[in-house]
Amino acid sequence: MSKSALLVLEDGTVFRGISIGADGSAIGEVVFNTSMTGYQEILTDPSYSQQIVTLTYPHIGNTGTNSEDEESNSIHAQGLVIRDLPLLASNFRNERSLSDYLKSQNIVGIAEIDTRKLTRILREKGAQNGCIMAGDNLDEALALDKAKEFPGLKGMDLAKVVTTAETYQWKQGSWTLLDGLPEAKDDSELPYHVVAYDFGAKRNILRMLVDRGCRLTVVPAQTSAEDVLAMNPDGVFLSNGPGDPEPCTYAIEATKTFLDIGLPIFGICLGHQILALASGAKTVKMKFGHHGANHPVKDIDRDVVMITSQNHGFAADEATLPDTLRATHKSLFDGSLQGIHRTDKPAFSFQGHPEASPGPTDAAPLFDHFIELIKLSVNEARSA
């Protein structure tokens, strides 16, 4: 028999449903994601730290879960909100039902609520703090108090919370249908050494860099520029991650150093915002952010439209871009800035997720541009 659950927003709105995860409570910023598939990748994306994820597609859990689709070692979303959990999970890769997966990691979830109504509230009022309670002892008043007590993501440095504790090497490429996840590549197959800052990095980003010949040294978020330069990298990657970029002064200062010496830099999501801040631009908190796998973005340089995967609640403010930065991509949903490129340095970034997982791969050529910048830099160093 299903246990009861409730979701209470900070404005006092109450949704009652059934529990699909662990007993207990979860507090965070409630956001909505419009992806139809990829719920396991979404849950394990560290960028969702301190957020309760509402999935707008009505049927979630159809394909179960498996060990190969995780984007990190654990679920990072605070809680999950869905309309309907199918009785059966059917897929040849299924290892565990979504409900069991949530319970195994002590994650609270709620189903059988009106997610359309919830999404309209978030769209019109903006992202709200909320509290999910699940189990036998549900207390609306207590849940409301907890939701109101949550400080919000503005000013919250979460990159140093979700980052790796130790530096490590990554040499594994992408999953394929026939072979699954491959063995780590030999150094002889990886001609470029890239140091990747882990602000909450997704595994598929690392895999796509390896696919293009990068031997990755993944370092903690607070690693100094001096320590990175001692590793003699051919380029630096600034990963995605959760929270507000402005408090990440350690990353901003390190990026300034890399810019000064002309090291190739590629940033994604939070890394995009950090590059913007290091270059003199400002960032802003968005009303409800972009979360989904169907966001149209215009590539200004190529004059084409890409369908992209998005997951961010902050954005670089185009009005504050200095002369050394030019806009390269814009959202066709709200006109917000989606990409920048330094005019004087081999550095660029993208707000969306070119690695997808889940989502389309229209923006994957951005990885190729990073390799082009690395090749130019390496050739210039050799001829100097």
From Swiss-Prot:
Annotated SUPFAM superfamilies: Carbamoyl phosphate synthetase, small subunit N-terminal domain (SSF52021), Class I glutamine amidotransferase-like (SSF52317)
Keywords, ordered alphabetically: Amino-acid biosynthesis, Arginine biosynthesis, ATP-binding, Glutamine amidotransferase, Ligase, Nucleotide-binding, Pyrimidine biosynthesis
One Gene Ontology molecular-function label: ATP binding
Residues covered by the Glutamine amidotransferase type-1 domain: 193-380
Binding site for L-glutamine: S47, G241, G243, L270, Q273, N311, G313, F314
Region (CPSase): 1-189
Residue ranges of coiled coil: none
GO terms under biological process: 'de novo' pyrimidine nucleobase biosynthetic process; 'de novo' UMP biosynthetic process; glutamine metabolic process; L-arginine biosynthetic process
EC number: 6.3.5.5
Gene3D superfamilies (UniProt xref): 3.40.50.880, Carbamoyl-phosphate synthase small subunit, N-terminal domain
Domain of life: Bacteria
Pathway, per record: Amino-acid biosynthesis; L-arginine biosynthesis; carbamoyl phosphate from bicarbonate: step 1/1; Pyrimidine metabolism; UMP biosynthesis via de novo pathway; (S)-dihydroorotate from bicarbonate: step 1/3
Residues of the active site: C269, H353, E355
InterPro entries: Anth_synth/Amidotransfase, CarbamoylP_synth_ssu, CarbamoylP_synth_ssu_N, CarbP_synth_ssu_N_sf, Class_I_gatase-like, CPSase_GATase1, GATASE
Catalytic activity: hydrogencarbonate + L-glutamine + 2 ATP + H2O = carbamoyl phosphate + L-glutamate + 2 ADP + phosphate + 2 H(+)
Record NCBIfam families: CPSaseIIsmall (TIGR01368), PRK12838.1 (NF009475)
Family indicated by similarity: Belongs to the CarA family.
Annotated function: Small subunit of the glutamine-dependent carbamoyl phosphate synthetase (CPSase). CPSase catalyzes the formation of carbamoyl phosphate from the ammonia moiety of glutamine, carbonate, and phosphate donated by ATP, constituting the first step of 2 biosynthetic pathways, one leading to arginine and/or urea and the other to pyrimidine nucleotides. The small subunit (glutamine amidotransferase) binds and cleaves glutamine to supply the large subunit with the substrate ammonia.
Binding partners and assembly: Composed of two chains; the small (or glutamine) chain promotes the hydrolysis of glutamine to ammonia, which is used by the large (or ammonia) chain to synthesize carbamoyl phosphate. Tetramer of heterodimers (alpha,beta)4.
Name of this protein: Carbamoyl phosphate synthase small chain
Taxonomic source organism: Photobacterium profundum (strain SS9)
Gene that specifies this protein: carA
